[in-house]
Amino acid sequence: MTPDGRITSEFDDTAIIEPEEDDELADLELVVLDLAGTTVIDDGLVERAFARAADAAGLTATEEDRAGVVDYVRRTMGQSKASVFRGLTGDDDQAQHANAVFESAYAELVASDGVRAVPGTEDLIRLLRDAGVAVALTTGFSRATLDLVIDALGWADLADVTLSAEEAGRGRPYPDLPLTALLRTGTTAVDGVVVVGDTASDIASGIAAGAGLVVGVLTGAHDERTLLDAGADAVVDSVADLAELLGFHDEDDDFADDEDGDDDFDEFDDEDSLDDDVDSEDDSALASVEGPGGR
């Protein structure tokens, strides 16, 4: 990846900007953003809370046990925390107890250490919503923990929808979170959905939901290779780079619709708009971003 945040990998073809290509994606309607590691800086809080919960559940009697728990937690990062504990314990009651300890420990860590947004997150969300694009914040945390983080950041009115795994039905890697966000926001087609996250589970969830674009970010748990191997259409340094990837231009700090009625999200414009003169000053420099297999 280059210093300016452009994608550099063997999958670069998935993010080439080609205004002349036929656009197979619908108009952009919804961006689904993960919470910890994607829009919120984790600072190791999740892993520390998991360690406390694992100790309380008796899962770390030896150093070998502890290493195994840490490895499992890292591999399953992004999934519902309750389901992770079920995988570790194999017992529902023990998993529920461990999850309760985790939620309590995470709340204590947020209170003592604070929580910070990934730089550029708030600007991105406001930009999207000003352009008429709905935004959902989703998480594997419980609703109580989600609300704690949202309140700590002052984000009560930032996004259109906030969703926990328990409210959607199943957590990642299942498609329930993106699809529930689609229903809650009145989004009309999965092709018009972009899913963004820092873990392989986020990517798998977006793919399972049939999202038009699935993007990985490098501010959280998993690296570029892991995200691409999981099927990400593109990987960027952080959510701050998402606007450029999606075709926004900020020359005049004005992201209103073009005079001809086409919006600045030309990646998701219909075929007719792509046939317009792409050299016009009023048109954005958007790209048709297609993933492997033409999804």
Language-model-derived ranges and their functions:
Residues M1-E29, R143, D147-R295:
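Asp-based, Mg2+/Mn2+-dependent phosphohydrolase catalytic module
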Residues D55, R129, I207:
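Anion (oxyanion) recognition and catalysis
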Residues R52, G87, L127, T180, ...:
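Alpha-helical scaffold segments in soluble metabolic enzymes
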Residues F11-D13, E18, E24-E122, R126:
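N-terminal helical cap/lid subdomain that shapes the substrate entry/recognition surface
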Residues L59, V133, A211-G212:
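Short glycine/serine/threonine/alanine-rich loop segments
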Residues V40, D71, G114, A136-T139, ...:
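A generic secondary-structure micro-motif detector
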Residues F50, T121-L153:
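Substrate-recognition element of Asp-dependent hydrolases with the DxDx(T/V) motif
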